[in-house]
């Protein structure tokens, strides 16, 4: 896939990615930075994943790819249970490594690292102390996407991941800068859909879709 700076009519059949954020975890309830922490789903998170799986059962999915962290694998396994597809893990779809901020709330980080937090919010090249910048996340997520989509034109692939990787893919589809991540909100167990065309253009079909959670 080549980046385009302007829209042109897409040619051929796209590879379709359905992007599913994992269900609720104890750290998402407490609004704590949860990057590499391998926390499981809560009971509510399991129910959310099951609701997403019920919706995706008839979505024509050809493959399921997930971040290797427990919360994403548990979510993906719910979909695997209704589709009969195996779950393949891809390390590139892990959440951001938040370094010294892991497990803390925004307020706690702001109190202890005020200047570092300000710099991080202003520049995607800046990483948390001991962690990973959004620019670095973008590089590995984009590389993972290329690996997953290779040879899959015309297929529908479910990618079960986290807030930052999913927002990164949305920004890439829209040709938006990394700073756009700060302008997006993504709920737990929310779905997004993107068409990726081999000749370059991408089409964002839906974002933060949680209709399955209200049924």
Residue ranges and their predicted role:
Residues 18, 88-90, 205:
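General small-molecule cofactor/ligand-binding pocket signal
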Residues 40, 83-91, 177-185:
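Short hydrophobic/aromatic-enriched beta-strand-loop microsegments
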Residues 205-215:
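Short, solvent-exposed aromatic-acidic interface loops
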Residues 2-12, 51-117:
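Phosphate-coordination/substrate-recognition cap region in phosphate-metabolizing enzymes
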Residues 7, 73, 143-201:
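Active-site-adjacent alpha-helix immediately C-terminal to a catalytic or transition-state-stabilizing loop
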Residues 16-22:
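Short, hydrophobic/glycine-enriched beta-strand segments
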Residues 24-79, 125-142:
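Loop-to-helix element that buttresses phosphate recognition and phosphoryl-transfer chemistry
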């Amino acid at each position: 896939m080549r980046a385009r700076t302007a829209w042109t009519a897409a040619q051929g059949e796209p590879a379709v990615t359905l992007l599913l954020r994992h269900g609720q975890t104890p750290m998402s309830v407490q609004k704590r930075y949860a990057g590499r922490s391998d926390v499981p789903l809560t009971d509510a998170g399991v129910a959310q994943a099951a609701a997403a799986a019920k919706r995706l059962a008839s979505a024509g999915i050809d493959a399921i790819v997930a971040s290797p962290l427990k919360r994403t694998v548990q979510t993906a396994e719910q979909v695997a249970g209704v589709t009969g597809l195996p779950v393949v893990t891809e390390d590139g779809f892990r959440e951001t490594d938040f370094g010294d901020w892991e497990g803390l709330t925004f307020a706690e980080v702001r109190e202890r690292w005020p200047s570092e937090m300000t710099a991080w919010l202003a520049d995607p090249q800046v990483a948390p102390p001991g962690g990973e910048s959004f620019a670095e996340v973008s590089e590995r997520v984009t590389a993972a996407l290329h690996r997953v989509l290779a040879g899959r034109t015309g297929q529908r692939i479910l990618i079960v991941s986290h807030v930052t990787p999913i927002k990164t893919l949305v920004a890439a589809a829209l040709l938006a800068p990394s700073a756009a991540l700060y302008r997006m909100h993504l709920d737990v167990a929310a779905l997004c859909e993107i068409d990726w065309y081999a000749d370059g253009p991408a089409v964002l079909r839906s974002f933060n879709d949680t209709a399955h959670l209200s049924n």
